[in-house]
């Protein structure tokens, strides 16, 4: 993905995370799969961008387990940091 599409994906992901009232593996997976479809990205591209933004790595334990363990506040902080790096 290029810089613009990565920025858009992460910005939409940040909005999504902010809107979630439940932050568990199943809710996260369902929400992010729907987001990928809505913004026209493959799950591979979206999930890869989120993984790198949140963990700094290309390979991690299962993404949604990782997000749930990190928690909403930490995930939001890391997404915002990644967005700042892209601007």
Show where each model-derived region lies:
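Conserved nucleotide- and phosphate/pyrophosphate-binding catalytic cores
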Residues: 1-87
């Amino acid at each position: 993905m290029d810089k613009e599409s990565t920025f858009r994906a992460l910005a939409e992901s940040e909005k999504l995370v902010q809107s979630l009232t439940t932050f568990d593996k199943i809710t996260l997976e369902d929400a992010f799969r729907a987001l990928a479809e809505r913004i026209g990205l493959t799950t591979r591209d979206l999930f890869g961008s989120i993984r790198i933004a949140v963990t700094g790595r290309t390979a991690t334990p299962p993404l949604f387990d990782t997000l749930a363990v990190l928690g909403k506040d930490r995930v939001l902080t890391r997404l915002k940091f990644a967005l700042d790096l892209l601007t």
